[in-house]
């Protein structure tokens, strides 16, 4: 529901996801969500799947993205480090599992708490702020460059 909420709040945005073996399961889950939350029905067309990428193409895809989001509750590790290496802010929310806490730990170590959400509402709000507030976005980029 996180990505649906982001898309509801940001009608000019799309979300790009990499295809993988879980795509069918994701669609099944989304089907259940859409049945219970019809407000999300219109945003599904703005979720784009692209095939798996080579490392360089993946980094290039990240570079041309406006905002990166850590997939909650799964999180990231290598992809988070790659986003930092190209100075792209990444919204995260720590989960209870270790793989969902790496980005949180990286941000804590860097003193960048503004990119850490405590719940879905904050996650969506931080993502929206990065998309709409250039000063906030630039501040996060500069903090990454300083680290």
Task: Label each PLM-derived region with a short phrase.
Residues 9, 43, 109-111:
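Short, structurally constrained coil/turn elements
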Residues 1-12:
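Short hydrophobic signal-anchor/transmembrane segments that target glycosyltransferases
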Residues 15-31:
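Glycosyltransferase donor-sugar binding loop
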Residues 56-58, 79:
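Short acidic active-site motifs
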Residues 28-52:
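Nucleotide-activated donor-binding/catalytic signature segment of Leloir-type glycosyltransferases, i.e.
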Residues 11-13, 87-88:
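Loop/turn elements at helix/coil->beta-strand transitions in domains of secreted/extracellular proteins
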Residues 63, 67, 71-147:
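Catalytic binding pocket for nucleotide-activated donors in carbohydrate/polymer assembly enzymes
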Residues 14-20, 51, 92:
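Short beta-strand segments
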């Amino acid at each position: 529901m996180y990505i649906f909420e982001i898309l509801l709040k940001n009608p000019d945005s799309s979300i790009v996801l990499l295809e993988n073996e879980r795509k069918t399961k994701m669609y099944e889950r989304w089907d259940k969500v859409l049945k219970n939350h019809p407000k999300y029905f219109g945003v599904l067309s703005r979720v784009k799947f692209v095939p798996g990428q080579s490392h360089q193409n993946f980094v290039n895809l990240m570079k041309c993205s406006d905002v990166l989001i850590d997939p909650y509750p799964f999180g990231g590790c290598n992809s988070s480090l790659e986003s930092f290496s190209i100075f792209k802010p990444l919204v995260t929310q720590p989960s209870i599992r270790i793989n969902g806490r790496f980005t949180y730990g990286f941000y804590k170590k860097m003193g960048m708490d503004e990119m850490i959400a405590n719940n879905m509402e904050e996650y969506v709000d931080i993502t929206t702020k990065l998309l709409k507030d250039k000063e906030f976005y630039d501040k996060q980029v500069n903090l990454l460059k300083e680290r």
